[in-house]
């Protein structure tokens, strides 16, 4: 957490760590960002980059992603979600984004289930020999762990994508 806290502090946000420096719990107070351009390394976690992409909408920000995950699944999921919320952004090269200050414009949004967590239930279906359905999850998911279902398919499992969700039998 220390890296993202430092990045946000350097952009003009006040963060007071209540216990150990660089860790939860902390208090954030801000009147906006002093910087209009930031760079974040995705090697540690692409979640920080995703959070920054979402927060950029509130103030307007140019973001440069560095590291190995600049084009990873979670970055793609975040950008897709922003589009669904009506957010416009400009992508320069593979790793640079310009997001102007805007408003989110979607009143209802179906959050896709976490495929990492769903894998346990799908694996359990093999052990107990019962069908398992995870609602609102589909094979066109952008989540990287969806590949687990293709591995199950190769092992002979029936993987069926229905309107309701994915069933393993």
What are these regions (language model features)?
Residues 1-169:
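Structural preference for solvent-exposed beta-strand-turn elements
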């Amino acid at each position: 957490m220390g890296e993202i806290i430092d990045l946000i502090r350097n952009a003009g946000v006040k963060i007071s760590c209540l216990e150990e420096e660089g860790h939860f719990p902390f208090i954030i107070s801000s009147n906006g960002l002093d910087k209009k351009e930031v760079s974040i390394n995705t090697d540690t976690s692409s979640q920080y980059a995703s959070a920054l992409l979402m927060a950029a909408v509130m103030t307007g920000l140019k973001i440069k992603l560095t590291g190995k995950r600049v084009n990873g699944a979670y970055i793609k999921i975040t950008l897709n979600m922003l589009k669904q919320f009506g957010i416009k952004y400009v992508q320069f090269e593979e790793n640079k984004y310009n997001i102007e200050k805007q408003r989110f414009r979607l009143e209802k949004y179906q959050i896709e289930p976490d495929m990492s967590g769903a894998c346990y239930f799908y694996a359990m279906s093999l052990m107990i020999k019962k069908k398992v359905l995870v609602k609102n999850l589909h094979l066109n998911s952008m989540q990287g762990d969806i590949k687990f279902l293709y591995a199950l398919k190769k092992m002979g499992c029936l993987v069926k994508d229905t309107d309701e969700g994915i069933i393993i039998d």
